[in-house]
UniProtKB/Swiss-Prot annotation:
Protein name: Probable transcriptional regulatory protein STH1004
InterPro entries in the cross-refs: Integrase-like_N, TACO1_YebC-like_2nd/3rd_dom, TACO1_YebC_N, Transcrip_reg_TACO1-like, Transcrip_reg_TACO1-like_dom3, YebC-like
GO MF annotation terms: DNA binding
Organism: Symbiobacterium thermophilum (strain DSM 24528 / JCM 14929 / IAM 14863 / T)
Family: Belongs to the TACO1 family.
Keyword set includes Nuclease: no
Keyword line: Cytoplasm, DNA-binding, Transcription, Transcription regulation
Length: 242
């Protein structure tokens, strides 16, 4: 009985931790969308998709509205700076981060500590940004898509997309940043559910890492993504599963 209860407690703690991580990620998506396109989901399609993901995850409406207000700067009591950090991870991979913080010094110290403790180094502005290109990225769950790949590609290209990449369980549609909203709206009109859409920094070339370097890199990326002030993390790593 006692051991069973301990197992139940551990399982619940793990589920709570996973739920908290999901809420944290979605909150960051909502804040970013509201910051870039405003607080109205009816006119900001990126925000509409992020809010839909929040509701699907059973995030309380109070949390959703707070994230929108913070992202759009509607809360006059809070002032945030937006910063881009660049650096190198194990194996020489490039890493870029979008930061939103109310204390630049605290965040810089935290991020520098995470890098140095896990085989990386925080660099100067511009040290790796030339290895990335800003693009719109739309993620679609293949299992939720009512049409085939060819039809999906035709709809996306007609709407202004640049490319479609097929993954094991999903599709990734790439657009110019200013075409992202338009393509997402056309997909919705065609009955294609969009899992996520964002303007992201996509690497133009990749660096292969494996073994201990890959493990160390994954730990570094996880810790960066878990930090409250880090909105997005991008890397040009090609991580081998071997």
């Amino acid at each position: 009985m006692g051991r069973k209860w301990e197992n139940i407690k551990r399982s619940k703690a793990k589920l709570d931790q996973q739920r908290g991580a999901t809420f944290s990620r979605i909150t960051k998506d909502i804040m970013k969308a509201a910051r870039e396109g405003g607080p109205d989901p009816e006119t900001n399609f990126l925000l509409k998709v992020a809010v839909a993901a929040a509701r699907k995850a059973n995030m309380p409406n109070e949390n959703i509205q707070r994230a929108i207000a913070r992202g759009a700067g509607l809360d006059s009591a809070e002032r945030f700076d937006e910063i881009v950090y660049e650096g190198y991870g194990p194996g020489g991979v490039a890493i870029m981060m979008n930061i939103v913080t109310d204390n630049r010094n605290r965040t810089a110290a935290d991020v520098r500590h995470i890098f140095s403790k896990h085989g990386g180094s925080l660099g100067e502005t511009g040290c790796v940004s030339w290895m990335f290109k800003k693009r719109g990225v739309i993620e679609i769950d293949r299992g939720e898509t009512p049409i085939g790949e060819d039809d999906l590609m035709m709809i996306a290209l007609d709407a202004g997309a640049e490319d479609l990449v097929t993954e094991e369980d999903s599709y990734a549609i790439y657009t110019a940043p200013d075409a992202l909203n338009q393509v997402m709206k056309q997909l919705e009109a065609a009955g294609v559910p969009v899992e996520k859409g964002e303007v992201a920094m996509v690497p133009t070339t990749t660096v292969a890492v494996s073994g201990e370097e890959a493990e160390q890199l994954m730990r570094l990326l996880d810790l960066l993504e878990e930090h409250d002030d880090v909105q997005n993390v991008y890397t040009n790593a090609d991580i081998s599963e071997a």
